[in-house]
Amino acid sequence: MTASASKTAQQLKYIKDSIKTIPDYPKAGILFRDVTSLLENPKAYSASIELLSEHYSESGVTKVVGTEARGFLFGAPVALALGVGFVPVRKPGKLPRETISESYELEYGTDTLEIHTDSIQPGDKVLVVDDLLATGGTIEATVKLIRRLGGEVVHAAFIINLPELGGEARLTQQGIHCYSLVSFDGH
């Protein structure tokens, strides 16, 4: 193993170890992966931004899109490191300029996301960033918004993947390449 690969492996272990697991939250049977514990640790937070930025440094990305709210915490610093613009995708009524919206299904109901109509230009190569990939519904709606504006989603990046919930498989079927720093078993 090269020195660089060894450093990366150490960083990934440190990131994973910094994420606390809360049993039975928000309901019985769920193992909640709390990314805010990573944010409380500047070494782990910095490593996560560094690794994502390095991974996409030669990707040709022209915009980074972050989903409300924790996607902002990782997407904006990655955009800054890549030297490209950051675009927030938010809940309805939170963006001041003209928007388009996309609704999506939740376990018990629906939700809606919005994006400014002038934030993505036709031909933009977009990296979508969020903290956690579970079922993929939020990212799927985000991708639809970007594509409606003429952007090309190059990749979707996450700190945490929960593969058993099927989000990565769902997004891959739609031609979206996913990259996660760490994965956890369970829900």
UniProtKB/Swiss-Prot annotation:
Q: Which GO terms describe its cellular component?
A: cytosol
Q: Where in the cell is it found?
A: Cytoplasm
* A biological process from GO: AMP salvage
The enzyme's E.C. designation: 2.4.2.7
Catalytic activity field: AMP + diphosphate = 5-phospho-alpha-D-ribose 1-diphosphate + adenine
Q: InterPro entries, per this entry?
A: Ade_phspho_trans, Adenine_PRTase, PRibTrfase_dom, PRTase-like
Q: Which UniProt keywords apply?
A: Cytoplasm, Glycosyltransferase, Purine salvage, Transferase
Q: Which Gene3D superfamilies match?
A: 3.40.50.2020
Q: Which domain of life is it from?
A: Bacteria
Q: Does the keyword Glycosyltransferase apply?
A: yes
| Molecular-function GO terms, alphabetical | adenine phosphoribosyltransferase activity
CDD domains in UniProt: PRTases_typeI (cd06223)
Recorded metabolic or biological pathway in which this protein acts: Purine metabolism; AMP biosynthesis via salvage pathway; AMP from adenine: step 1/1
Q: Which SUPFAM superfamilies match?
A: PRTase-like
Alphabetized HAMAP family for the sequence: Aden_phosphoribosyltr (MF_00004)
Indicate the family of this protein. Answer: Belongs to the purine/pyrimidine phosphoribosyltransferase family.
Free-text function comment from the UniProt entry: Catalyzes a salvage reaction resulting in the formation of AMP, that is energically less costly than de novo synthesis.
Q: How does it assemble?
A: Homodimer.
- The name on file for this protein is Adenine phosphoribosyltransferase
Lineage here is: Bacteria, Pseudomonadati, Pseudomonadota, Gammaproteobacteria, Enterobacterales
Protein encoded by which gene = apt
